[in-house]
């Protein structure tokens, strides 16, 4: 007779295997789907080399990594702030990256290359992260640090609104496209941004022990000997980096970091040894499928992926909000 622990372990393995298969199928669909359907047997043809390897593959890898980063960031923040409604934009890091990108667009008059825009977005996210770490060094409680992040996000949102109000029509088109999120401009030139995500993603997936302690609450984590101040600073910095790079790649994409971790917890994946890799797989799968919808929904244009995730995620967010209020 299997013990309860072994049964749970087998169930967790089955979940990870199912999520891995789902991600591989979503990856395959993303590479095949488009204006022209290209089956795997045609990938070695000249048409396949152009459309699949040069156009679709870099975009698909970017979608996969950003989806994984946003979902893991959501799981980290929900454990760190003991709030199931926490998500990557909550601390203002996404808006900070947006301010950096908008400043680059306006000051560069739309002439800066994509790599420079990416660096400015990362710089904006890291500046907000440094401000948050400054607050954290004052040993604020988690709730106060959360409120500080919300306030910073509101300030950054106001700055973006002012910038859009005073921008020209050409700049406004680029800014509005960024605010809705999209992978349309991603190619192999952004591979350095993709590589910048991988080490942090892998490192966080290996930090299940402190994450499990943090999920028990501040008091319990201290009693178990966890250096709370150190881990809070490190996790805030790692989240800021992942969100900044994600914004630099694709703009503002919401609800992935909110919905994916919560759904996996409802499915019984509460141990961060399973939850963190599960979030990476499920977040990548969800964003890959949303990207396919964004590409195929309209014949003559491509939907912003942020619109797709918001349309699908908003009802779930309302449901979570009502459930949390009971």
UniProtKB/Swiss-Prot annotation:
It comes from the Bacteria. PANTHER family: FERRIC ENTEROBACTIN TRANSPORT SYSTEM PERMEASE PROTEIN (PTHR30472), VITAMIN B12 IMPORT SYSTEM PERMEASE PROTEIN BTUC (PTHR30472:SF29). Pfam families: FecCD. It is found in: Cell inner membrane. Belongs to the binding-protein-dependent transport system permease family. FecCD subfamily. Part of the ABC transporter complex BtuCDF involved in vitamin B12 import. Involved in the translocation of the substrate across the membrane. It comes from Escherichia coli O17:K52:H18 (strain UMN026 / ExPEC). This is Vitamin B12 import system permease protein BtuC. SUPFAM superfamilies: ABC transporter involved in vitamin B12 uptake, BtuC. GO terms for cellular component: plasma membrane. GO terms for molecular function: vitamin transmembrane transporter activity. One of its GO terms (biological process) is cobalamin transport. The keyword Translocase does not apply. The complex is composed of two ATP-binding proteins (BtuD), two transmembrane proteins (BtuC) and a solute-binding protein (BtuF).
């Amino acid at each position: 007779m299997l013990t309860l622990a072994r049964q749970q372990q087998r169930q967790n393995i089955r979940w990870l295997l199912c999520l891995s298969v789902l991600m591989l199928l979503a990856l395959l669909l993303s590479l095949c789907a488009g204006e022209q359907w290209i089956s795997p047997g045609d990938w070695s043809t000249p048409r396949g080399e152009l459309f699949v390897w040069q156009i679709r593959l870099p975009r698909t890898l970017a979608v996969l990594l950003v989806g994984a980063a946003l979902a893991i960031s959501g799981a980290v923040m929900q454990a760190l702030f003991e709030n199931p409604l926490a998500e990557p934009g909550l601390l203002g890091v996404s808006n900070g990256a947006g301010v950096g990108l908008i400043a680059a667009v306006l000051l560069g008059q739309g002439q800066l290359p994509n790599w420079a825009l990416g660096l400015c977005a990362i710089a904006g996210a890291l500046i907000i992260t440094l401000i948050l770490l400054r607050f954290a060094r004052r040993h604020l409680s988690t709730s106060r640090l959360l409120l500080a992040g919300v306030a910073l996000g509101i300030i950054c949102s106001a700055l973006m609104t002012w910038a859009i109000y005073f921008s020209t029509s050409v700049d406004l088109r680029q800014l509005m496209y960024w605010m809705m999120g999209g992978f349309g401009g991603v190619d192999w030139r952004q591979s350095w941004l993709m590589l910048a995500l991988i080490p942090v993603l892998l490192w966080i997936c290996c930090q299940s022990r402190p994450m499990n302690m943090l999920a028990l609450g501040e008091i319990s984590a201290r009693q178990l000997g966890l250096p709370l101040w150190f881990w809070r600073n490190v996790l805030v910095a790692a989240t800021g980096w992942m969100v900044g790079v994600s914004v630099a790649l694709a703009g503002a994409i919401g609800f992935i970091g909110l919905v994916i971790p919560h759904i996996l917890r409802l499915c019984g994946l509460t141990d961060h040894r399973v939850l963190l890799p599960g979030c990476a797989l499920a977040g990548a799968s969800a964003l890959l499928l949303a990207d396919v919808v964004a590409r195929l929904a309209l014949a003559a244009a491509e939907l912003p992926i942020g619109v797709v995730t918001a349309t699908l995620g908003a009802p779930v967010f309302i449901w979570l909000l009502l459930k949390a209020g009971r």
